[in-house]
Amino acid sequence: MDDYGLVSIITPTWACAPFICETIRSIQAQTYQNWELLIQDDCSTDNTLEVVRPYMEMDSRIKYECNPTNSGAAVTRNNALRRAKGRWIAFLDSDDLWMPEKLEHQLKFMVENGYAF
């Protein structure tokens, strides 16, 4: 498989503890594995951090940060973007899933056709 460079996956979250595990697992199941997952919490009122913590401990590519105050979706995404180290940026909400070959197919298409994320 080609290496297209690091993909920074931005996952904004707010009170998605019941769903975020499946989201994380769908990222870990990607056939393209050169990624970092930046979970940016907008001051969740549930146990999102406790749910995410075991994934961070097992996979150093998963990083979590919480906004200082509840700020809304745009600020939350922008805060994560400032931390991104990847050549590519992808967004995945914390209650959504990706098919296993999503990144691989998308990157291949974009590189072959001269597109950017």
Please annotate each region the language model reported:
Residues 1-117:
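Nucleotide-sugar donor-binding/catalytic module of glycosyltransferases
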